[in-house]
Amino acid sequence: MTRKAWIIGASTGIGAAVADELDSKGWNVVRSSRSKGEIRIDISNDESVFEAARKYQDQHGDFDLVLVMAGFWQRMSAKHFDLNVFKEHNNTNTVGLARCAAAVLPEMISKNRGTFVGVSSVAGFRGLPGSSGYGPSKAAQINFLESLRTDLVNTKVKVQTVSPGFVKTPMTDVNTFPMPFIISAERAAKIIVKGLYKEKNDIVFPIPMAISMKLARLVPSSIWPKLFKKG
């Protein structure tokens, strides 16, 4: 039986690359985004998400693999804090992921099968300069997915978290700051799909960035801000 994957946020970047990678491995891939795809979806809108989930079930049946890869990023520092930008990060990244979970997990739980995957970021591991909107939304995603995973540990429903470092995409092309260890979207897709096949709870990459950010968690909070002092 052909395996089915619904990729939400598949128009460009990592989502498009993951869709291509799964397609090359024989998966029946349904691509969704706000502007393109067989099923249009706007994860910042409740009605859009639940309607898209209904369309998917009508056209393709059960949810085998659902990957939520859509997201929002805008650099924002404390000196230029904008509450509306913070809310947009939260509504798209955090609540958007929760909307998708609410739309597909009940069916997965009912059938006791399926895999739900959320794409977060290593930016959620620790507070970073210019990330006062993006970082908190990604930290919330990581915690949310882990909470779901603990709730579903005695079922056959799997929840996986993807936390990339810098990946070359239209989203990162606008960045004017250094992006260490940056990799291509195609390379990222291969790592993600390999992690999906291995059923890893957390897929963190590239390795140098994963190690750096995991070590960063060990730095005392009294010292962490001082690492970013200039001069």
Regions found by a protein language model. Give the residues of each.
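Residue(s) in the substrate-gating loop at a strand-loop-helix junction
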Residues: S121
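C-terminal helical subdomain
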Residues: T161, F177-M213
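Active-site helix of classical SDR
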Residues: A101, S137
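Substrate-binding pocket helix/loop in short-chain dehydrogenase/reductase
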Residues: S77-E88
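Conserved NAD(P)H cofactor-binding loop of Rossmann-fold oxidoreductase domains
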Residues: M69-Q74
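Rossmann-fold cofactor-recognition segment
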Residues: R34-E47
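N-terminal Rossmann NAD(P)H-binding glycine-rich loop of SDR-like oxidoreductase domains
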Residues: S11, A19
